[in-house]
Swiss-Prot record:
Belongs to the microvirus D protein family. It comes from Escherichia phage alpha3 (Bacteriophage alpha-3). The gene is D. Assembles the procapsid by joining twelve 12S pre-assembly complex into a T=1 icosahedral particle, called 108S procapsid. Ten proteins D bind each 12S complex, which are formed by three pentamers of F, G, B protein and a H protein. The scaffolding protein is released from the provirion after genome packaging to form the mature virion. This is External scaffolding protein D. One of its GO terms (biological process) is viral procapsid maturation. The keyword Coiled coil does not apply. Keywords: Host cytoplasm, Viral capsid assembly, Viral release from host cell. GO terms for cellular component: host cell cytoplasm.
Amino acid sequence: MNIVSDVNYATSVAALRMLQASAVLDVTEEDFDFLTGDKIWIATDRNRARRCVEACVYGTLDFVGYPRFPAPVEFIAAVIAYYVHPVNVQTACLVMEGAEFSENIINGVERPVNAAELFAYTLRIKAGFKETVMDAEENARQKLRANGLK
């Protein structure tokens, strides 16, 4: 790995820690089951899939009524690695393509990633966070239950 990859990976570690600490997911239990479930998303699920992933990315902002701002690839990939069932990871990357790495956002460089790049980066995250990702669904379900959702 080069220095940029190390920085990107460290950014994803920080994103994953934020996800774990956050109790705010702006999704219903039905949408959470859709997001984390093993049912393969089909073409007609595209809008719902994007809405569900975005709800996890922007949940806190949406909950308090603040406007959204573009999330970096590292955060979106962490959300996909953390919440989306493996059978739907490629589809999630397809519907979420177009984000940019944090380094590019900071430097004002416009270079959106495509689905293949987002997928490759998500795989890198899943490889590095195996134990954390494996426990993600139960962790999130416990938080939903604690907030009164079943």
